[in-house]
């Protein structure tokens, strides 16, 4: 995935906060994925408008972390979700 990619959740896939259980879930047709707060923060930025470089920059600033470390983790996570067809680039 290159820096100009604009990741987004495909139609029918939703990120939701389950307030009763205090957890984030990624709801896809016939599948549910539990995601942690960090993954949810990444997915909230995947709106199809922001490029990957902008998402990484936002997260690096938010968490005061090196961009290269954030980028490696984000690319790995998004690649995994793309392989599961719950993310498009």
Predicted segment positions?
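Acidic, low-complexity/disordered tracts enriched in E/D and polar residues
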Residues: 1-40, 44
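Long, charge-rich, low-complexity alpha-helical segments
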Residues: 31-89
């Amino acid at each position: 995935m290159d820096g100009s990619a604009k990741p987004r959740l495909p139609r029918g896939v939703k990120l939701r906060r389950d307030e009763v259980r205090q957890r984030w879930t990624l709801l896809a047709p016939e599948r549910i994925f539990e995601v942690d707060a960090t993954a949810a923060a990444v997915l909230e930025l995947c709106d199809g408008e922001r490029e990957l470089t902008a998402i990484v920059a936002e997260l690096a600033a938010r968490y005061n972390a090196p961009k290269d470390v954030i980028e490696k983790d984000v690319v790995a996570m998004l690649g995994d979700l793309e392989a599961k067809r719950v993310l498009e680039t």
